[in-house]
């Protein structure tokens, strides 16, 4: 089943398009990684998929329904987002932050019931941070906050999960745990779209890689072709030899 369809979409701001004529689709249980330099438009594309940034042209559909026709509650039940950072202005506990992921299923003036707490705690356990449940959000490290944001998104039980550089603040062990979690979500039928600066992460989990170029053009294909040193070198402004040297994975060798 096709989960996400993007048809001739141009995204950005009035008079300043960032990406033009983007078209691709993702099926249920697939993982797609967005690769591109800083400022290339990866986050802008995700904000448009979420309905936070109106399209300049084209359309985006989730399960064959245009996002423009979905209510905010229906959109929140269909798609969740893990942003790069969240500084939280209030003294919420980690569990309270994760429970916010259950908002699409709770009445406006209702309180989370026991089953909602079980769902939130289960996501904290999945990511190995159940011990942080009662911690104040303001006391967390950057990596701990990132894991809690992932738990909050998973608590939404979305069909489509968007992750914006989710490993950027994680130590090596938590990166491994994150990749294992993404594989498990894929096996359970969730569709994942992840922006990353780690080609090895894309190689480890992605079915499809989308290259976001500096000129606003987008190309996509399997990791075996999109993650070659020559392609990555052009994307990040370095040489193929530098790619091979720094990544050191057999896939990237000549």
Model-identified regions with their sequence ranges:
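The feature captures the beta-strand-to-loop junction immediately N-terminal to the Walker
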Residues: 35-37
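Helix-to-loop junction immediately C-terminal to a conserved catalytic motif
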Residues: 50
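Conserved ABC transporter NBD signature motif
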Residues: 58-66, 75
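Conserved ABC ATPase signature
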Residues: 136-140, 144
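Conserved catalytic motifs of ABC-family nucleotide-binding domains
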Residues: 157
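Catalytic Walker B motif of ABC-type/P-loop ATPase nucleotide-binding domains
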Residues: 161-165
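H-loop (His-switch) and adjacent beta-strand-loop-beta switch element
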Residues: 209-223
């Amino acid at each position: 089943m096709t989960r996400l369809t993007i048809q001739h979409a141009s995204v950005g701001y009035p008079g300043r398009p960032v990406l033009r004529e983007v078209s691709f689709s993702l099926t249920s249980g697939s993982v797609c990684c967005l690769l591109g330099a800083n400022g290339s438009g990866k986050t802008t594309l995700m904000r448009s998929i979420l309905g936070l940034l109106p399209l300049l042209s084209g359309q985006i559909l989730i399960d064959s329904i245009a996002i423009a026709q979905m209510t905010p509650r229906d959109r929140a039940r269909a798609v969740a987002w893990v942003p790069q950072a969240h500084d939280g202005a209030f003294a919420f506990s980690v569990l309270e932050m994760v429970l916010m992921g259950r908002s699409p299923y709770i009445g406006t003036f209702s309180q989370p019931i026991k089953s909602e707490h079980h769902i939130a705690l289960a996501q904290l356990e999945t990511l190995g941070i159940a011990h942080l449940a009662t911690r104040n959000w303001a006391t967390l490290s950057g990596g701990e906050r990132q894991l809690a944001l992932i738990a909050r998104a998973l608590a939404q039980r979305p069909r489509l999960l968007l992750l914006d550089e989710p490993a950027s603040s994680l130590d090596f062990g938590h990166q491994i745990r994150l990749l294992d979690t993404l594989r498990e979500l894929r096996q359970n039928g969730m569709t994942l779209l992840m922006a990353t600066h780690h080609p090895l992460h894309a190689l480890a989990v992605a079915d499809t890689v989308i290259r976001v170029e500096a000129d606003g053009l987008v190309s996509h294909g399997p990791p075996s072709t999109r993650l070659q040193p020559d392609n990555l070198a052009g994307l990040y402004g370095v040489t193929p030899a530098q790619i091979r040297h720094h990544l050191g994975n057999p896939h990237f060798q000549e």
